[in-house]
Regions:
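Cytosolic regulatory modules rich in charged/polar residues
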Residues: 1-172
Length: 172
């Protein structure tokens, strides 16, 4: 394959070694093994050869010493921010009740939405869209709010911009 600048692209140069471990391996033993072999990831394999999960050395250390803040972590206290009146930037995992309290309206009180099945903003948008929306896609709520997908991967929504048109119209 090729990279954007036309140079040859070698995926082998990006591959990193990975440990394969059973779910029964004690944390301390796995941590020592990762340190000794200088490998930072382990794939947890079940008895049938299926994948139980992926662990990083950071995951293990956090189990011992507690949460470690790094440049990739988002402050959970700020699961959404008001950019301006009527416009919010929010993590998809923002609890729906918390966001509804902020904007003063119930987003699940509608025929198209099963209130029992939705806990987060991302879940609401997924339910409204009927699929995992792509970055840039705008999903409209039947009651007016618009959800623009700011960040997503093929499996999940990560960040949203929420616009409340009625609030924006009042300001215009």
């Amino acid at each position: 394959g090729f990279s954007a600048d036309g140079a040859a692209f070698d995926l082998r140069g990006m591959v990193r070694p990975l440990l394969f471990v059973p779910p029964s391996m004690p944390l301390g033993v796995l941590l020592q093994k990762m340190q000794a072999e200088r490998i930072h990831m382990a794939l947890v394999i079940d008895e049938y050869g299926g994948t139980d999960g992926l662990l990083t050395i950071e995951d293990l250390i956090e189990q011992v010493v507690g949460e470690i803040e790094d440049e990739h972590d988002v402050d959970e206290a700020d699961s959404f921010i008001r950019e301006k009146p009527g416009v919010y930037l929010a993590l998809a995992k923002t609890p729906l009740e918390e966001f509804e309290a902020e904007i003063g309206r119930n987003l699940t009180d509608h025929d198209e939405i099963d209130e029992e099945e939705v806990d987060t903003l991302g879940g609401l948008v997924f339910m409204l869209a009927g699929h995992v929306p792509a970055r840039g896609e705008v999903i409209r709520h039947p009651e007016g709010p618009e959800f623009e997908v700011i960040d997503a991967d093929p499996r999940r929504i990560k960040r949203l911009r929420v616009r409340l048109p009625d609030v924006l119209d009042q300001l215009a």
